[in-house]
């Protein structure tokens, strides 16, 4: 039986934050944990499935591999055994693993590092930049490791083991039949205390700074696409690993083209004489101009497809087309002389209207039949 998508298992979207993933798993763990459903095999399977999904989506490296390769990208992590590779643990251990400050942080009696927060940055591009790709320098306000104490929070000394929890970061408490772990109130889950805080970062191990980064934009990117820069988010507290930076792309509207997938669309206005008699015209594309032949008797709404003049697909490399939508423009602000010529021309057309304006004639015939049948 094929494995379900991890995001589907937890009921979160692809952009879910770590906090949202934890919240979703907590809800499922409370519902399906075997301690709450003794003897229920279906609940046991669902709990294992949820825990496996949580273990992957809350680990930035595993999640990146899963997002790129699917289950195959993390199979080695679980030895191909699926969710069966996980133990249940008691509810206290689970909550301690998920909810840090509430239930104590890490498993196995070790303090859990507080990873830095992920950051989001909106990058606005022109259509040309999105289609052709480029490198763009961005400036991101963030937290970086303190250079004075190298992120430890202690200047000129090392942090000491917490005397309250003996370095575990947690205090185990008994609540009825449940045994839960609570964060140590002295070290706040770190397992260490700082006796001589760094004066530059006030013992946090990090400082605020605007970071300058170069972002490589691949050709074919579009609005809604996201670029992940691993480790470029906020620095963690007390030397903990940094978060990631997600660059969210938004492409500005273009005066000539609008994009649909890998195809570009453009309205091409022509005068009514060119529509009737035909002609040639220069058509702009994102790679220069091309000549388009307008055949005689071209009607408004006619589409011409210029193959290979669209966008190169971001992943497959296939190239879309440029689709030109013909708009026949009615002349305006005519002089009296021009109006006279048009009236004479109209009279000439009426002599053989069925041949010159078949759609108009057919439309009037249909209208006549419609009212006659009433």
Swiss-Prot record:
GO terms for cellular component: cytoplasm. Signal peptide: none annotated. CDD domains: DnaJ, DnaJ_C, DnaJ_zf. Keywords: Chaperone, Cytoplasm, DNA replication, Metal-binding, Repeat, Stress response, Zinc, Zinc-finger. Its main location: cytoplasm. Its cofactor is Zn(2+). Binds 2 Zn(2+) ions per monomer. GO terms for biological process: chaperone cofactor-dependent protein refolding; DNA replication; protein refolding; response to heat. HAMAP family: DnaJ (MF_01152). This is Chaperone protein DnaJ. It comes from Coxiella burnetii (strain RSA 493 / Nine Mile phase I). The gene is dnaJ.
